Amino acid sequence: MWTEEAGATAEAQESGIRNKSSSSSQIPVVGVVTEDDEAQDVFKPMDLNRVIKLLEETDKDGLEEKQLKFVKKLVQCYQNGLPLRDLAQIFKILNLCSGKIKNQPRFIESAYDIIKLCGLPFLKKKVSDEITYAEDTANSIALLGDLMKIPSSELRIQICKCIVDFYHAEPPKKHIPGYQQASSSYKIQMAEVGGLAKTMVQSMTLLENQLVEKLWVLKVLQHLSTSEVNCTIMMKAQAASGICTHLNDPDPSGQLLFRSSEILWNLLEKSSKEEVIQQLSNLECLLALKEVFKNLFMRGFSHYDRQLRNDILVITTIIAQNPEAPMIECGFTKDLILFATFNEVKSQNLLVKGLKLSNSYEDFELKKLLFNVIVILCKDLPTVQLLIDGKVILALFTYVKKPEKQKIIDWSAAQHEELQLHAIATLSSVAPLLIEEYMSCQGNARVLAFLEWCESEDPFFSHGNSFHGTGGRGNKFAQMRYSLRLLRAVVYLEDETVNKDLCEKGTIQQMIGIFKNIISKPNEKEEAIVLEIQSDILLILSGLCENHIQRKEIFGTEGVDIVLHVMKTDPRKLQSGLGYNVLLFSTLDSIWCCILGCYPSEDYFLEKEGIFLLLDLLALNQKKFCNLILGIMVEFCDNPKTAAHVNAWQGKKDQTAASLLIKLWRKEEKELGVKRDKNGKIIDTKKPLFTSFQEEQKIIPLPANCPSIAVMDVSENIRAKIYAILGKLDFENLPGLSAEDFVTLCIIHRYLDFKIGEIWNEIYEEIKLEKLRPVTTDKKALEAITTASENIGKMVASLQSDIIESQACQDMQNEQKVYAKIQATHKQRELANKSWEDFLARTSNAKTLKKAKSLQEKAIEASRYHKRPQNAIFHQTHIKGLNTTVPSGGVVTVESTPARLVGGPLVDTDIALKKLPIRGGALQRVKAVKIVDAPKKSIPT
């Protein structure tokens, strides 16, 4: 409360310093309100500078009492909050008081009271005060951490309470006119800026044996660690290792372990995880974690203890990811393996004797966390022997079996299913490292039997309510998925003993059967999981069949059928992101490993138009598939039946395979930055195949066993494969090529010559760099090779020019033909238009009609034969009573010779025996059948 005494004192102070001050604006003041002034909203200033000056004075009688009195009145004045404008001076007063504590213990109370004020709201007079006084506020709050050095338990606890109050801001007890409370997060932000977290971490070293104060500091750090800025500051102050090493300190309340674990959690989440792990990866920290975990594992029975135990295990798992962490040296790895397997494998170790996990949520989570930590630990190879000693493989295999009826299970059905999936996933990581243990436990037989159950129609209701159970609700997809993943991991060890055992147990046939069963029952709902299962099956088959003809024969036509089924997938699905790309990669891998090299399978693949499907995929222009598809085609071209299939293929717009391959070559060269002109012609005949990368790289001397840049270029792009395919198809007989294709084909045809020239050129340049002088004959040979390579380039460039010129001429001729057609079309249109105009003129103008008729008659008359044949019948062209305004068309109906003259229908059809009448008209019957010689005189027709 603002008191009358405080008001009177303030007035006295004001009158006392009036003559010393040059202006009132230079005096930092705070409004001191008396009971009378409060009603009038009038503030009385208090001279804080005088208080500071008073505290700085020494060696005066009664000075201590006076100083304490002024500080007490100061506390009374600010009991409703601290104005930001006065904060710097108030904390200076606090600092002066704390400096006197050592010689004048009575100042502890004054410092305590001022610190208590810091828990009150900060007040601002203007909105801009938060920004204006930000630096002063940050420095003032940072001073709280420095005051932790004062050896006063009461003072330290009050400092901690004050900081905790930052996170639980309360409104002012009383409204002060003209002031408003600073934002609730202002103190927290200023604590971050001032670096309070660092001094609080450092204060931990002063509290080794002072539990109460240590717990308060941990509470403060717990609040501070909710901020990323503070976590970074704490991490740099080595907070992680400092807190972790004291986890085992005696604490009946249990707060130390709880608060410490939460601080470690926050540091791992909100600061540099790698740096925090590095701080915790020392023997002292791991020993502390080990002891805490063992105590909680063996003696923790409450929900709180079990949850804390799991948190410690998660932190340990994160530390175990660091290969430099001495997990084995401190014995933690051995204990974790024991705790992970004691439920499944009996152990006489005293640590687990009489222990049993319940089916509570915390113990269930613990079991999964222990499986997870085994996966992390097995990445450190020295751990392998401990895994063998702990019989981890045997313990995990206890879950790889179908559910048994009438058996008492410690876990619920859902829990057992999740643990089963987790165990199989763990085996996928551990089994490849412990392959001998895996085989001794009959691992292949167990997994194949479990897969057989997964494929069966046995009733089983899966819950699918976990990460590993994703996509497996109401079916066995999750179990099948992880079992196949385990088999894939084992197969890809390429251990012949393991793979032979799998093949003898009929794995190839079983995998093909599972695949066929899956594709016969489409499941769109779980499509992503099904695609992963299919991919794993194909990868397992590839691993088993590679380099084994007999196994490829077992793969046979049924295997080819499933491969072809995948290759017929709608290309649009390749962009769906559901795993079709992975499935297609697996399919192409299975073609390489399971079909190529086995002639019956190759022939069946060709018979079923497999090459067409490969070329269809190649035409999709997916760069990630091109290299693999072309490699497969190179091998397939060794089969004499392949060329006919390749040449018979047609893509969009009747594109041929040769045209497609040449197009891919051009695209590859464009991406590689090979120099070509606009027509695709060689520019640099000395370096016709050089890429932009080769241009940038300088030739350096290399050991004989290191491939040069020119050699590496062969394997790093698809040009060599395209050359090999076109070479096997015969360069001279490639159908469906354009002139542009032929220009590119000239380069492809000489690819090997150019590449040999490149390599010799590198050899020559290396000799120069090493300053070697070859003998005369070698030098001449090198020069001859270089010249020959350049001449080949010039020859190819010349041939390309001829092709381009020939095509240009052909294009010119084609253009002229098209132009001639256009001219003829235009001329025909003009004639048609003129004819139409004439027709309109005749039908609309009588004079024009008469003129046209006159011209027609003249034309008819001019076309007649003027010498009339003897005995010929003359037909009139004019028919009486007929009026027409148009000329006759191409079809004219004419009344011929009357029937009386014809003599009836033609009875005899053997015209060759008849004598034709010379009078014209229709055929007539003649009586004589005697054949006479034709008259020798000429008869007009």
Swiss-Prot record:
Annotated Polar residues bias: 16-26
Superkingdom classification of source: Eukaryota
Compositional bias ranges of the Low complexity kind: 1-14
Gene Ontology CC: cytoplasm; non-motile cilium; sperm midpiece
Cell compartments where the protein resides: Cell projection, Cilium; Cell projection, Cilium, Flagellum
Region (Disordered): 1-26
A UniProt-annotated Pfam family: CFA69_ARM_rpt
UniProt keyword terms in alphabetical order: Cell projection, Cilium, Differentiation, Flagellum, Olfaction, Sensory transduction, Spermatogenesis
GO BP term (any one): sensory perception of smell
Annotated tissue distribution: Highly expressed in the testis, specifically in sperm (at protein level). Expressed in the brain, kidney, liver, lung, and intestine.
Disease: Spermatogenic failure 24: An autosomal recessive infertility disorder caused by spermatogenesis defects that result in multiple morphologic abnormalities of the flagella, including absent, short, coiled, bent, and irregular-caliber flagella. Malformations of the sperm head have also been observed. In addition, patients exhibit very low sperm concentrations and total sperm counts per ejaculate.
Annotated function: Cilium- and flagellum-associated protein. In the olfactory epithelium, regulates the speed of activation and termination of the odor response and thus contributes to the robustness of olfactory transduction pathways. Required for sperm flagellum assembly and stability.
Protein name per UniProt: Cilia- and flagella-associated protein 69
Species lineage: Eukaryota, Metazoa, Chordata, Craniata, Vertebrata
